[in-house]
Amino acid sequence: MGVKRVRRVGTTGALVAATLGASIVLTPSSASASGTWHCHGTQVKRCTMIWWDADADTFRARAKITDADGGGNYGVKVNNVRLQRYTSSTGWVTVRQADDNDGWHAISDLAGTSTIDPCAGPPNSFRAVAAFYWRGAGSGSETWHPNSATSRDC
């Protein structure tokens, strides 16, 4: 009877530990940064976003390129990522840039600029622009940005 009691306590303790461990692992942390990827392409996905860090109240441009599943098995790279600001007097002007010349990648590449305070200066709109490259069955390159911009109500 004493052995059964120990076994039950051990089993109960293991179940409590497993449940507690699962709840800790599965509970998402409250992320302070957010953004939405804007993508195009079928065999090679090219994407940009404005990444907003709510805690620091900053923007950065991010870009990624991915060889899509079932595609032509392309090598990919992204570089010359730019965060651009628009004002009525200057048009689109690059305010942050990341060259990110880390070479070709088998599946995907991700790059981003340093941050900027979107509230410094006059009201603005921002966009992300990047240069995308792919090689394989058919090679190509393009500098692309989505037809959208992000602004911050400061």
Task: Set out the residue ranges of the language-model regions.
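Secretory targeting and sorting signals
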Residues: 1-33
